[in-house]
Amino acid sequence: RKVLVIGGGPAGMEAARAAASRGHRVTLWEKDSRLGGQLHYATVPPGKREFINLVDYYTHSLAEEGVEVVLGQEATAEKVAAFNPDVVVLATGSRPAPAPFPIQPGLQVITAREALAGAPTGSRIVVIGGGAVGCETAVALAETGTLKAEVVKFLIENEAESFETIRELVNRGTKEVTLVEMEAKIGRDIGISTRWVIMKHLQRLGVNVMTQARVLQVDAQGVHVEKEGNTMVLPADTVVLAVGAVPVRDLAEELGGKVPELHIIGDAHSPRKFTEAIREGFDLVRQL
C-alpha cells in the first residue's frame, strides 16, 4: 500500500521504518530541514547527548528500508490529496501549551523548547513548571558557564587550581535559576530510574526549587506567585514556560473524508514520552 507519514519525529520515523519493512511503499514528509523532532531538545540536558544517536539510527534505517524522505515539506490537505496515498499517518507532534496565567509586557518570556534550542537568556531565570521538561530545562540552564570535562582535566593535570575551587566551578554556572511548581513534588512524570539523577543535578547546581507555588502573573517586575497564602515576586530577566504541550492535528480535520485511511499517532494524538511514541509507531503497522 502507498503510505504517507507526515512528521519526522520519533513516532513518525518508527511508523515509516516499520511500514517499509513490511513491504509498503512509504514516503515521509517533514516540515523542518532535519529529522528527529523533539529528540533534538532531549539531547541538551546533561547526560542526554547520546539520544542524538537515535536520529542517526533512523536516518540510516529509513534509507536502508527505501523510505522516501522529503524534508522541508509543509503538509496541506491539498498536497496530501494530490499525492493520493492509500494510508496517511499523522505524526505532527505537539506545540507548547499556552500559559494559564496573564503575561504582561516588559520581560523576556520563552518556551522550554526555545531555551533548549539555545535562545539567549538573562542571568536570573525562572522556569515555570516542574515536570520532566521543566526540571531538565532548569538543569540545562543552570549548567551554563560551568567547567566542561576537558577543562577540568587540564586544570587537574596542571595543578592550576585547588580541588575545592575546581569543584565549585563545576557545580556553579553563570545563571541563577529558580524552578516553580504548583504541586508538592517536582518531576512526578520522570521515570523512577532517572528521577534521582535529575534531583541530584538540581541540588548540585544550586537550582532554587519552589513547590506548592501558584503563578499569578508575569510582568516587568518578575513572576508573581502565591505560596501558603502569601504573595511574592520572583525577580527575573527571563521566564521559561514548561507548562505542558497540546497536540498539533489541525490537518486531521482538513483531511476528513479526503483520504481512504487516516491514523493519528504520537504527540499528535496526545503528548507522551518519546519511547511511548516510538512504540505506537511500531504497533500501528499491524493495522495497515
Over which residues does each language-model region extend?
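Rossmann-like dinucleotide/flavin-binding elements
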Residues: R1-K31, L35, V70-N84, T92-I103, ...
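Catalytic cores of secreted or luminal carbohydrate-active enzymes
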Residues: V87
